[in-house]
Amino acid sequence: MKTQWSEILTPLLLLLLGLLHVSWAQSSCTGSPGIPGVPGIPGVPGSDGKPGTPGIKGEKGLPGLAGDHGELGEKGDAGIPGIPGKVGPKGPVGPKGAPGPPGPRGPKGGSGDYKATQKVAFSALRTVNSALRPNQAIRFEKVITNVNDNYEPRSGKFTCKVPGLYYFTYHASSRGNLCVNIVRGRDRDRMQKVLTFCDYAQNTFQVTTGGVVLKLEQEEVVHLQATDKNSLLGVEGANSIFTGFLLFPDMDV
């Protein structure tokens, strides 16, 4: 404590002596300036001053060094679907696939046209050897086949029940000249000659044959007709036969 007071009193005494010296010097007209006193001790720091005005914005600094890569973040949500792209080129044909399973059974079909399944056919022999008059219908009285009974053996005439295309043919044995007509028409009307087959031979056996396709209407009649040159035979070993059958029914009727 004594030391602190001595440190304080010493400078004060020196200051007092200086003041006395100055006062004496001022009272003397010819005194010289005294020696400068010892500097005083620093004063107590003052309080903080008011904040200054903001300074002018400085220039942009240089870019800093690149920082280290951060850790990988979590996967984000899916984005909105983009606009569909253009259609690409057609690809190559792929390999043939395996057969698929059988499909379900289809519905039952409708009833078919009875005409499409209609069957008409006949074959008949002539077994009598009697003479024939010109324009007379030639009877083939022994029936071999007569499906649907459209051929009448007692008259030798075929009557159409199913309109359509028919084929008629005959094989006739004779000894001498033979001419045979194939005729058609309504049985009640005048018959029309379609064609004539002739074969001329004297005193010798021969076989004459002919055939034709006819489009017939319902109830139209077809038969073979004798002429004035007729040596037709109907005996064992020299048979004559008349045949006809339906090729195609007329579906429009």
UniProtKB/Swiss-Prot annotation:
Alphabetized Pfam families for the sequence: C1q, Collagen
Sites bearing 5-hydroxylysine, chain numbering: 57, 60, 75, 90, 96, 108
Subcellular localization: Secreted; Cell surface
Signal peptide positions (record): 1-25
SMART domains on file: C1Q (SM00110)
GO MF term set: identical protein binding
Chain sites annotated for binding Ca(2+): 199-200, 206
Pyrrolidone carboxylic acid PTM sites in chain numbering: 26
InterPro entries per the UniProt record, alphabetical: C1q_dom, Collagen, Collagen/C1q_domain, Tumour_necrosis_fac-like_dom
Record's compositionally biased regions (Low complexity): 78-96
Ranges where the C1q domain occurs: 115-253
Activity regulation (UniProt): The C1Q subcomplex is inhibited by sulfated molecules, such as triterpenoid sulfates, heparan sulfate, or chondroitin sulfates.
Domain (Collagen-like) ranges: 29-112
UniProt tissue specificity: Highest levels in spleen, lung and brain. Weaker expression in kidney and liver. In the spleen, localized mainly to the red pulp, in cells mainly of monocyte-macrophage lineage. In white pulp, localized in specific dendritic cells such as those from the periarteriolar lymphatic sheath (PALS).
PTM description: Hydroxylated on lysine and proline residues. Hydroxylated lysine residues can be glycosylated. Human C1Q contains up to 68.3 hydroxylysine-galactosylglucose residues and up to 2.5 hydroxylysine-galactose per molecule. Total percentage hydroxylysine residues glycosylated is 86.4%.
Domain comment in the entry: The C1q domain is the ligand-recognition domain, which specifically recognizes and binds the Fc regions of IgG or IgM immunoglobulins.
Protein name: Complement C1q subcomponent subunit B
Organism for this UniProt entry: Rattus norvegicus (Rat)
Gene: C1qb
